[in-house]
Amino acid sequence: QMNDVILGAYHGGLGDNLQFSTLPEEFYKQQGRETYLVDGSNFRNKEIYDLVWGMNPYIKGIKEGSRNAGDLPEYTDKKRTGNWIKDWELVHGLEPVNERPKVYYEPKKFDDLAGHFLVDLSSITINHHNTGYGYDLKEVERTFQNIRTRFAKNIFLSVEFDNYVGEINKFNVNTDGVSKVSSIFNYCDQLNSADGIVCFYSGSMVLATAIQRFNPNL
């Protein structure tokens, strides 16, 4: 009988948690181990917990103790497979089988978003004052215009979140309109329905890669 897995992400963001989303199922299937979230896990907002762990049937509950899975210091010298989700599976002693993070919510399809690109140039951890950890805004603007030219037939909609998701650094570009997002689940639905998303290397990008399981053309 192998010990239970006590999993936790050091940071509470969406991408921070999604990067471990394939582990509980694989621990169960490959090693017959139950996975619990470490007591005291913090989440930037409750919806991150709801989507990533609350709906994950392989999470058995919350457990006190020290975590033995997640972004632990001993896992920094990672083996490389060329894919970061597989890397996490590998360092946790699992056969690496997943290339994308996983959500267990079945997203809806909105026909009226066909032919549309979502634009979410917001990020919580990346700041855009051309300082160190961030993006050169002129470069962002240029890249966005290139994408618009390349997909001239598509309609581009700026994503606006109804609920508080955290202190957001947002870079505004000209789009054709707005798509209001009422919840993280509604965001999954929209990503499942759109032709593409323009975003930074942020939680939205990680979520989009999970939704590619349902919408491979995203």
Where on the chain are the PLM-derived regions?
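Catalytic machinery of carbohydrate-active enzymes
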Residues: 1-218
